[in-house]
Each structure stands twice: as C-alpha cells, then as structure tokens.
Amino acid sequence: MRVKLGHVGHFGLAVHNPEASAAWWQANFDLDEIFRFDDGIGLSNDNVTIVLTKGRAHPATIGHMSFHVADMKTLRRALTALRKNGVDLEDPGDEIGPEAPGSPHLGLWFHDLDGYRWELSVQDGGRQA
C-alpha cells in the first residue's frame, strides 16, 4: 500500500532571527502570526503555515519551495510589490519565466532574508501570458 499525501500541513525553517524573518514574511505576503514559542514564530493563512525557528539556516538543503498564485495578473502584481519592497529577485529585468525548460507554468523566483529560494507560479501561465 502507498500512502496518499494530502495538503501540506506546515513546514518549518531554521532562520537566524525569527522576529526579523516573521516581519519580512508579513511585510511581503498575506500571513498572520498564529503562535509563538521560546525559539520561534508560526505564520499562516488559509493555504499554508510556516514555522520559523531560531537556528542555523541551511538554504542549500532545499532547492526551492513554490507557491501557486491564481493567474498572471496576480503574479505581475506580486512582482511589482516585491520589487517595491526591495526583495531579492532572480533574473532582474526578466523575472517571469517558465518553471523549467518547456514548462507551460510560469513563475518568478526570490530569496528571503536567510537565503532560502522561493517561487511564485501560475499553472498553465504560458497560456495566460
């Protein structure tokens, strides 16, 4: 028997400074603080919970994580907001592109305060472009 995975419940990241990291996430994304503990903070919205724990960040251990957005209009708005907020975006001037060569999905990539790599993507975005 193989176990079918459901939606991601939450994921945890080791970060240098949970307070600074939580502030960064909340300044850039629709996330609310839902709990605190001695060494960390949990942020959440209707789709995801991110637990930021004080520790040594290891961004190279995760290639990247991707969040889907509704459509290309939303992705373009996100790009504008991230630029305005000074977020470390990949491929300056040509930020939106295929998730992988030949993929119909379009996205953009950025890095958080600890160097973790993230993606915002639109499924079948190439058809909407």
For the regions a protein language model found, what residue spans apply to each?
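Amphipathic alpha-helical segments
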Residues: 17-32
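Vicinal oxygen chelate
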Residues: 1-4, 8-16, 44, 57-129, ...
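N-terminal beta-strand motif that seeds the catalytic metal site of vicinal oxygen chelate
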Residues: 1-20, 49, 62-65, 124-129
